[in-house]
Amino acid sequence: MKAIEIYQHFLSVADWVDPARTVDKITLGDPEAEVHRAVVTWISSFDALRYAVEHGYDMLITHEPTFWDNRNDLANIEQAPADSLKREVGLRKKRFVEESGLVVLRIHDAWDGMPEIGIPWAWARFLGLGTRPAAIGAVRYQHRYDIEPLTLDALASRIAARTAAIGEPVVQVIGDGERVVSKIGIGTGCGCDIETYVRMGCDASVVCDDGSCYCFNIQWAADNDHPVIRVNHGTSEEPGMVTLTQYVNDTFDGVTAEHLPHGCSFRLVGA
């Protein structure tokens, strides 16, 4: 199967994606290249690209951008000033991929909104919150799950017990640990606007670091007496990479996909 056919399939099944505006694309590589083996990973880091090349994959499917910008990542690197350090590293990264023949495909918008198996659904199942959200925000990837009442700290401990398996054994918490909560907002990536969760009737929110910085969203939540649990961006989307790998294996004849774990982006070091 050609790389372009895999990309076009995702656009064809994602009617919520505007092809003219989506960040989903073949970032690097020949769209006409035949793909037999693909590796699926959360972000196309240099390490992940090297892994793909060293292990003979034809395609790397990434959820996040290759060149550190959400929309026009490659163009921004190529047009950056000649003395830009980002440009230097970006062009080195680009050259490595081009010389290898690897195809880099970004699948972000399609997988964020894929019902039941996409990013927020996979995250909720991983956390044990359920399979069907009680409410979904207008942008599709902010969900509310109604669960049996428990204290905020009990919920945080329950989440940490799950995320420990992918490298994050502790989570950040804002709010009274004894507060009883049951209507839980969850989101990943940039889809973590806490005001939206409040409007959805949530009494606590589970967000990620890239989508909720402290001095803006989270401090507003604290001042509004709305509890927040925060994890790393990579942690929250790892379960969705597992489901994406399975989807590729189930959908594309002649293509074998393998999952390259990423998990929490940080090592956690104590005293």
Language model: regions and residue ranges:
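Active-site catalytic microenvironments in core metabolic enzymes, especially phosphate/sugar-handling
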Residues: M1-A271
